Structures are given as structure tokens and as C-alpha cells.
């Protein structure tokens, strides 16, 4: 019976992707699909794209593919083009080659596996790659989301949290994240779907099981520094590096925190945010800090 591996939210994390590629090879799967967000939130997007293209794995387009393509095409507010808060996004967009961008731009929003005609794979929901399904999604919300679905099995991603949920006669699976898990487990995460040989006519014939793969996070720390991404992206790159350490969402909580304070993102808020969020010691242990040349909390490079 067929085995289908689905991975997503790689987010330019090559060491995590390489560990998952090796694990998939050991699982004897028959088909592999990438459910979006190959790039963004990390420094090696071009390398990830080349890896996936060389393997010939089918992909769908995630919201971060859209974000970086929009930056490259100038489809973003004028203020973002010089705003230090968006320096990391500009860096990531420029890191992609023309061939990378063309590949990402051609990706579909939905994919049906060759060996799973009753499965639909999307990045977020059938309606949008910027919406997500997570443990917090209510039955009423899920019912609304599934009205757009024309198959009994939905595989999605986007929230960076693995999920397996039966809803009536349907199965909803969130892959979790390869490169930036937000469930407190720093291992790279993906899912394998196995077809059940004895499923009845009205039964869901797929069984889902997540895989959790350890990888060398020290290598990721070195890549952040050696590529120049940590310096170029300012506080946003530092917050993304902290997400690698904590396996929790850090950037979005920071932006919400800043908005509530009526401030703007910048190094002057770094220490206060980390202290209030309880991540100061984690950041210190990982060597993630404001530029030492900045005496007043304002970034100086």
C-alpha cells in the first residue's frame, strides 16, 4: 500500500531539511510532497529550493513564497523598502535567484498526490495560504473551512504545530514544521500517510503518523552568522534565531507586544521584551544579543 510523506515550513533551514531528507529515505515512502514555505524566516532559501527541485518533489505555494516574490516585484508598501524592520525580508528576497523565483511563482496552491487521489494538500486552508488550522481551531471554524474541500483528507501546514484530527468522515492533518516548529519540540517535523488496506467504502483509508527528526542546531547558528543574515536582518533576524532555540513563535508575539506599546521594532526594545517574555536567558545562552556597538539600543552597523 502507498506511503506518502508530506513536509512543510522548511523556512530556509538546510540542516533541518537535510536531516528530514535522510529520514524520508529510510522510511521507504512512495511519494513526497512539500506543503509550502520552503523559504522565508531563514537565510538559505535558494539552497532549499535547489534541493527540492533536484529531488523532483511536488510543492504547493505558501504565504512566505508570496511575501518574498512580492518584495522582489516591488508589490509591497513603499515604506517597507527602506524600513529596518523589513531588512531581513529584503535580504531573503534578494538571496533568491531568478530561477528560484520563477520556480516558486509557478507553484500551485493545491496538490493532489499521484498515489492519493482522495487527499488534498494545501499550505494553510483550501481557501487561503495565509490561514491555518491548529489545536485552537473550533469545530464550527473547521466545518466552515472544510466546506471548500472536495476530498475526505486534508493535509495542511502554516501553523508550525503538528495535528491529526478526525472531523466526521474527514481527516485533517497538519504536518508541523521542518525548520521552525512552534510546539516546543525543536526537532524537524513532518508526517507520513499510510493507506489502510482493509478500510471500508465509507471509512477514511489513510493513517497519519508524525516523524520527529533531530538535527544539528549549532550548524544553523553558524549559518545565521556566516551568511550575514543575523546582522543584516537586525532585531527581526535575532527573533527568528530565538525561534530556532525555543521552538516557539517569537517574532509575532514581539510584533503584537510592540503594537500594544505603540512603538516600533528596534534594538531599544530587545532586553525589555525578552525579560517580560521569559526568554532572556535562552537568548544569552545562544549568543543572540543586540549589537555591542550600540550603546543606546539603536542598531549600528
Regions found by a protein language model. Give the residues of each.
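Active-site environment of divalent metal-dependent phosphoester hydrolases
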Residues: 11-16, 40-43, 64-70, 129, ...
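Core catalytic region of metal-dependent phosphoesterases/phosphodiesterases
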Residues: 2-101
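Active-site-proximal segments of metal-dependent phosphoesterases and phosphodiesterases across multiple
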Residues: 79-83, 115, 119-149
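Acidic, His/Gly-rich catalytic cores of divalent-metal-dependent hydrolytic chemistry
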Residues: 166-175, 179-301
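Active-site-proximal beta-strand elements of phosphoester/diester hydrolases
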Residues: 2-11, 118-126, 172-176, 210
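Anionic-ligand binding region
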Residues: 140-153, 157-178, 188-190
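Glycine-rich phosphate-binding loop signature in dinucleotide/nucleotide-binding domains
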Residues: 24-29, 114-115, 148-150, 192
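Short acidic-hydrophobic surface loop/beta-edge motif
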Residues: 109-117, 165-167
